[in-house]
Amino acid sequence: MSYWINKSICKLNYDSIDNIINTIEPHKPYNNNYCKDNFNIKYLDENNILDYYSFLYKNYNYKFNLDTIKWLLLNPFSKKEYNILLYNEDKIAGTISGIKKTISLHKKIYDCIHVTFLCIDKDYRNKYLHYFLIDEIMKNAKKNDIIIALFNSNIKFNNVKYINEYDTYITYGNKNLIKKSDYFNYELLNKKTQDLFFIYTIEEYNYWFNNNHVVVISYNNNFIALLKTNMLINKNIIQIFIIMEMYIRNNNIHKNYIPNNTIIYENYKCLKTIKLKSKLISYIYNYNFNNLSESIYLF
């Protein structure tokens, strides 16, 4: 808690007015002289993306292919300084990325970053580099007038208020997958009833959901988008699918429309499932709240 106590993240004992965005970040960067003296920062580009890909494949839970990484992180909506690579000489020691998104938060529209790919090489995990990287990406976001960030963690931070905690599952036993692709009115994604959800322009919708990196299942104006990747499970690399977006209008998506090996949250179960040990806890940076109903899917 020593790091988070000085950060603008909602605390369990926070007694100020709820539903208020903090516009001023405390000027207390994480004091890591080791990091300052021994590391240098670069940003992801075509020149270092192969090194980045190898680093993630070695150190990150999900095993993305190179084209998917390029599509996710070198997208036309995010700034290059949202993809931070921390080098010790010529070796990547840690990374963090932020994908620029737009959210509806209590019916008001804000830009934010979806923070992901926070990854530290195992040789450096006792140096608290993740705190330094979080400070760096929030500093860069603020320079572009973005102060809200969303992120998942498998850690429940002491005395920090989280949006939601999810069990995770892998589905199995579906040998008759049907990829249903009826017309879907994307504007329905922008009209959800929850307090917090992503919204999209037509350009963003086409970029994120009209490609070979996701499986889109649409039926009778129900919509699920699943990000394709791989994961090491029981010493085997298997293909999995992670929910990126979902709009369930009437629960009439048939179980055979859902792929095998789907990392799926507890609010939408299908087929036979294996409950994983890991949980996902979602947080919001720079926003104080009491309860916050949401329809966001982070990875």
Curated annotation (Swiss-Prot):
Keyword Isomerase tagged: no
Keyword Kinase belongs to the record: no
InterPro entries in the record: Acyl_CoA_acyltransferase (IPR016181), NMT (IPR000903), NMT_N (IPR022676)
Catalytic activity: N-terminal glycyl-[protein] + tetradecanoyl-CoA = N-tetradecanoylglycyl-[protein] + CoA + H(+)
Keywords recorded for this protein, A-Z: Acyltransferase, Transferase
The protein's Enzyme Commission number: 2.3.1.97
An example Gene Ontology molecular-function term: glycylpeptide N-tetradecanoyltransferase activity
PANTHER family: GLYCYLPEPTIDE N-TETRADECANOYLTRANSFERASE (PTHR11377:SF5), N-MYRISTOYL TRANSFERASE (PTHR11377)
Role according to the record: Adds a myristoyl group to the N-terminal glycine residue of certain proteins.
Family indicated by similarity: Belongs to the NMT family.
Full protein name: Putative glycylpeptide N-tetradecanoyltransferase
Protein source organism: Amsacta moorei entomopoxvirus
